[in-house]
């Protein structure tokens, strides 16, 4: 029996892929997963390339693993994920001690690649895009808690000027709806209560049914809501361009779909949105939000923002701040623009000083944090339904769970409550977390 250590960086899709790798390898009967890196015979790094810092982080990590390989020459190092797909053979040039490079769509071939390396001691690479082949090998999902994320589609066809996803994950491909529903049903039977549907552009889902018909995302959401045991449904990440009325209508008739939506806008300036090739305007985005509020009056919105995009003026940035206030976003993921090789934006002149970018990022995050706290204060003394997930990491005398709007709540309660929905009264609020007590 050999031990495998997996380190995962990046999005929830990467986390899902790593869980698939675990199931694939353990199913062979030859491997066990370990959390002790020094104990491992095979080291797997599942990578992210969405920003330059994340990419360089990969090679720093590989440098640390090189020291382990110097001590144990038979250790196999495998690099997967988006950096692997983007860099390919260049990884071997920068880190010639790496044995395997596999792509986002070839992780099901990893056991076979490990076998070949062990026999021939030659490096292996497969970063091809065999479409949904990896899901054809899907095995019984592994429960790791009372919430679970599953991939319903991969890739993106939008080709935003700053984004590497179409190059690292391929074009949009949707899993068959019956495969998704079966996987969720198995998870529900094993105690999962909340499901998160994943995709780079999840609302573009167009999966085939068993009789060859198309199942649209709105229909899939309703089908998931009918699965016994699943009481909460989330999804991420969606694109405003395809956030259609039929999806909005699900918020009217499907209470299991949470009143919290992550809908990236990226900028509040139409000029910058055009340069980003986002294919919508702030006015069109605002119209979607207005319809969502009509469908679900208590819905809260989070978003993504990029500051310092090439040629972004102070006026453009101020439009973003004004838009943030107008929509009243609850939370955000916000970043300084990072040029990615091979994207159209990388050819644009980056004429904004780094200190100015940092200043804008600070201003934007400060604005969002004030709004986050404002949303949290509205929850004070309210009663919230919380899915209890486990013992608090900060205080072992307390439990923690999440509200529908993604707030962590800590409280004193019995361990028998873990995995169940309970009612809590909110007694104290912080920006991103809450404290409650049992009713």
Swiss-Prot record:
Domain TRAM: 377-439
Record-listed [4Fe-4S] cluster 2 binding positions: 156, 160, 163
Signal peptide: none
Intracellular or extracellular location(s): Cytoplasm
Annotated catalysed reactions: N(6)-dimethylallyladenosine(37) in tRNA + (sulfur carrier)-SH + AH2 + 2 S-adenosyl-L-methionine = 2-methylsulfanyl-N(6)-dimethylallyladenosine(37) in tRNA + (sulfur carrier)-H + 5'-deoxyadenosine + L-methionine + A + S-adenosyl-L-homocysteine + 2 H(+)
Pfam families xrefs: Radical_SAM, TRAM, UPF0004
Cofactor: [4Fe-4S] cluster
Enzyme class, broadest EC rank: transferase
PROSITE patterns registered for this protein in UniProt: MTTASE_N, MTTASE_RADICAL, RADICAL_SAM, TRAM
Homology family: Belongs to the methylthiotransferase family. MiaB subfamily.
Role description: Catalyzes the methylthiolation of N6-(dimethylallyl)adenosine (i(6)A), leading to the formation of 2-methylthio-N6-(dimethylallyl)adenosine (ms(2)i(6)A) at position 37 in tRNAs that read codons beginning with uridine.
NCBIfam families for this protein: miaB-methiolase (TIGR01574), MiaB/RimO family radical SAM methylthiotransferase (TIGR00089)
Name assigned to this protein: tRNA-2-methylthio-N(6)-dimethylallyladenosine synthase
Lineage: Bacteria, Pseudomonadati, Pseudomonadota, Gammaproteobacteria, Enterobacterales
UniProt gene name: miaB
């Amino acid at each position: 029996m050999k031990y495998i250590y997996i380190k995962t960086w990046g999005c929830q899709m990467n986390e899902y892929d790593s869980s698939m790798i675990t199931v694939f390898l353990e199913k062979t009967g030859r491997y066990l997963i370990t959390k002790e890196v020094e104990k491992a015979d095979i080291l797997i790094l599942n990578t992210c390339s969405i920003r330059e810092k994340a990419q360089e982080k990969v090679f720093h990590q590989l440098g640390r693993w090189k020291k382990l390989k110097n001590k144990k020459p038979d250790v196999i190092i495998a690099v997967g994920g988006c950096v692997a797909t983007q860099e390919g053979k260049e990884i071997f040039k920068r880190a010639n001690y790496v044995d395997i490079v596999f792509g986002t769509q070839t992780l099901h071939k990893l056991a076979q690649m490990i076998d070949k390396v062990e026999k021939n001691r030659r490096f292996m690479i497969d970063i091809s895009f065999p479409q949904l082949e990896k899901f054809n090998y899907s095995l019984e999902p592994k429960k790791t808690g009372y919430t679970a994320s599953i991939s319903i589609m991969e890739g993106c066809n939008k080709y935003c000027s700053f984004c590497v996803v179409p190059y690292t994950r391929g074009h949009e491909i949707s899993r068959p709806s019956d495969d998704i529903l079966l996987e969720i049903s198995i998870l529900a039977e094993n105690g999962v209560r909340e499901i998160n549907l994943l995709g780079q552009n999840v609302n573009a889902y167009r999966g085939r049914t068993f009789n060859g018909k198309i199942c649209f995302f709105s229909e899939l959401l309703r089908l998931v809501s009918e699965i016994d045991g699943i009481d909460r449904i989330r999804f991420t990440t969606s694109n405003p361009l395809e956030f259609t009325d039929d999806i909005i209508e699900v918020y009217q008739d499907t209470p299991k779909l949470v009143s919290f939506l992550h809908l990236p806008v990226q900028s509040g300036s139409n000029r910058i949105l055009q340069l980003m090739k986002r294919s919508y305007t702030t006015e069109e985005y605002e119209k979607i939000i207005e319809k969502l509020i009509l469908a679900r009056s208590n819905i809260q919105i989070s978003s993504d923002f990029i500051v310092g995009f090439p040629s972004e003026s102070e006026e453009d940035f101020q439009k973003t701040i004004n838009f943030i206030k107008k929509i009243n976003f609850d939370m955000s993921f916000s970043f300084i623009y990072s040029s990615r090789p091979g994207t159209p934006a990388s050819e644009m002149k980056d004429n904004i000083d780094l200190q100015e970018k940092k200043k804008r990022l600070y201003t934007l995050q400060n604005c969002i944090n004030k709004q986050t706290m404002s949303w949290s204060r509205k929850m004070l003394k309210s009663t919230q339904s919380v899915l209890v997930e486990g013992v608090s990491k900060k205080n072992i005398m307390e439990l923690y769970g999440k509200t529908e709007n993604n707030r962590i709540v800590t409280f004193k309660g019995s361990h028998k409550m873990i995995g169940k929905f309970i009612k809590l009264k909110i007694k104290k609020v912080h920006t991103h977390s809450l404290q409650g007590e049992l009713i």
